[in-house]
Design a protein with these regions (language model features):
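Ribosome large-subunit tunnel/peptidyl-transferase-proximal elements
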Residues: 2-192, 196-199
Length: 202
C-alpha cells in the first residue's frame, strides 16, 4: 500500500487517521514541522516530513539489535500500538506507568539496559526520557506540535494523542522496519495485520 506521490501510504489515510492534526499550542522547536493552522486553531503538521521521518527512523532502528530497543508509552492510547510495534520488530516495551529507576537502578526487577529508547510522547514519557539522557542513550520520539525537542535525538512529527494516529504510525513503522530486514512486504503485512487491531480500545 503506497501512494503515487511517493508517500509510503496514500495521503488520505494519513489525514483520515488525523496524523497531521496537532495542538492549539506549538513549541518553538516544532515550527519547522508545521504547515499551517486550521479553522479550529489547531496547528497542522507537514505529512511529507512525517512520511520521510518514518523512513529515516526505520533505517536508524535497524542499526540496533532488536532486543536492545525499548519502546515506551505512558499515554493511554499509545500503549497497545507501542506494545504491538515492539512485538512486531522484536523489541522490548514498557507501557503504562514507567517504574522510576528502570534504566538506572540494577537492583530493580524492571531494570533494562537498552541501547536506544523510543518514546511515544516526550512529555508523558518524561521519566524514561530523563533516565535515558542520564545513561547516554539515543532517543527517538513521536512529537506533536506542542512538544519540545530537547533531549530527542530523532523526532517523528505526528499526532501523538489520537488512538487512530498512534495506531497508524506504529503499524507503518513496523512495516518499514520489517521491510528493510526483508522480513515482510506491504501486501503480506496488510494481510497479516489488521490496522484496526492496533488501535487502543480504552
Amino acid at each position: 500500500m503506497s501512494d503515487e506521490t511517493g508517500l509510503l501510504i496514500p495521503l488520505e489515510l494519513y489525514e483520515e487517521s488525523g496524523v497531521n492534526i496537532g495542538t492549539k499550542q506549538k513549541s518553538a522547536d516544532m515550527g519547522r514541522f508545521i504547515d499551517s493552522v486550521n479553522s479550529d486553531g489547531l496547528y497542522l503538521l507537514n505529512l511529507n516530513q512525517t512520511d520521510n521521518r518514518i523512513r529515516i527512523i526505520a533505517s536508524f532502528l535497524n542499526q540496533f539489535e532488536p532486543s536492545q530497543i525499548m519502546v515506551v508509552s505512558a499515554r493511554q492510547y499509545g500503549q497497545r500500538p507501542a506494545r504491538m510495534f515492539a512485538e512486531a520488530i522484536g523489541a522490548n516495551s514498557a507501557v503504562g506507568r514507567f517504574i522510576p529507576g528502570s534504566l538506572t537502578n540494577p537492583a530493580l526487577r524492571s531494570y533494562k539496559e537498552p541501547d536506544i529508547l523510543f518514546v511515544t510522547d516526550p512529555a508523558s514519557d518524561q521519566q524514561s526520557l530523563r533516565e535515558a539522557v542520564n545513561t547516554g542513550l539515543p532517543i527517538v520520539g513521536l512529537v506533536d506540535a506542542n512538544n519540545k525537542l530537547r533531549n530527542v535525538d530523532v523526532a517523528l512529527p505526528a499526532n501523538n494523542k489520537s488512538r487512530h494516529s498512534l495506531a497508524l504510525i506504529y503499524w507503518l513503522l513496523s512495516r518499514e522496519v520489517l521491510k528493510l530486514r526483508d522480513a515482510t512486504t506491504d501486501e503480506a503485512l496488510a494481510e497479516a495485520n489488521d490496522l484496526e487491531e492496533w488501535k487502543s480500545t480504552f
